[in-house]
């Protein structure tokens, strides 16, 4: 998948392809972003391997995160130069807004927190903030080639092997957990359709 994204980014940079949104699901894997700290990996590589979890260092921004079945991962391949070279932080904020809109249609109220990247489930409770989506962007030239991970039906316990995004004060959650007994049928398909629709509407991205 990394090679596929890299090819897509090169094609977009060369003008041979349009802006694209890749939507997919990864097998169990822990990825280390450019800001990842060793102490945020709570299990040694051998222990991860014994549980069938791969470990990779990647070129996106951010710290450490987990990907696995039940999580919708989106890679936005976007030529920011063709869009007037907007601030990358502004691009991140737009992704957060798109995810909040899609989550609202799924029945999950969501919000963003000043100074933090990602999307959180609301209302805020007496416990720790509940993070439902993580975002990490990588750039090649002015082309983005990383994106977001939305926990749809993924068991949040999967994150126990890391300090997610380096935030010890955060608890991970999922759409399924937030909905409880209100979980609709075909939740994963519905989430994918809504995210694709909102990205297409807000970014004019063609899902792939």
Indicate where each model-derived feature is located.
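Residues immediately flanking
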Residues: 26-27, 34, 139, 152-154
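C-terminal accessory segment of soluble enzyme catalytic cores
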Residues: 120, 138, 149-208
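Short, acidic Gly/Pro/Ser/Thr-rich loop/turn segments
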Residues: 30-31, 39, 142, 157-159
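A broad "ordered helical/assembly scaffold" signature
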Residues: 99, 127-130, 147, 171, ...
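Short, conserved beta-strand/beta-arch hydrophobic-aromatic motifs that form part
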Residues: 41-44, 132-152
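N-terminal lobe of the biotin/lipoate ligase/transferase fold
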Residues: 1-129, 181, 185-189
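Gly/Ser/Thr-rich helix-start
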Residues: 34, 62-63, 69-71, 137, ...
């Amino acid at each position: 998948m990394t090679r596929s994204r890299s090819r897509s980014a090169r094609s977009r940079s060369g003008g041979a392809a349009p802006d694209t949104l890749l939507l997919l699901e990864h097998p169990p894997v822990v990825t280390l972003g450019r800001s990842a700290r060793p102490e945020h990996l709570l299990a040694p590589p051998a222990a991860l391997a014994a549980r069938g979890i791969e470990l990779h260092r990647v070129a996106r921004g951010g710290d450490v995160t987990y990907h696995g079945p039940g999580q919708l991962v989106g890679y936005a391949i976007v030529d920011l130069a063709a869009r007037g070279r907007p601030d990358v932080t502004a691009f991140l904020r737009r992704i957060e807004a798109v995810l909040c809109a899609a989550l609202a249609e799924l029945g999950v109220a969501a919000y963003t927190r000043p100074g933090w990247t990602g999307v959180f489930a609301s209302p805020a409770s007496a416990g720790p903030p509940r993070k439902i989506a993580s975002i990490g962007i990588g750039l090649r030239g002015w082309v983005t080639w990383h994106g977001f991970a939305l926990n749809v039906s993924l068991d949040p316990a999967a994150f126990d092997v890391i300090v997610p995004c380096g935030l010890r004060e955060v608890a991970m959650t999922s759409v399924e957990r937030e909905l409880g007994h209100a979980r609709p049928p075909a939740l994963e398909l519905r989430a994918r359709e809504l995210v694709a629709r909102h990205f297409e509407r807000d970014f004019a991205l063609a899902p792939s």
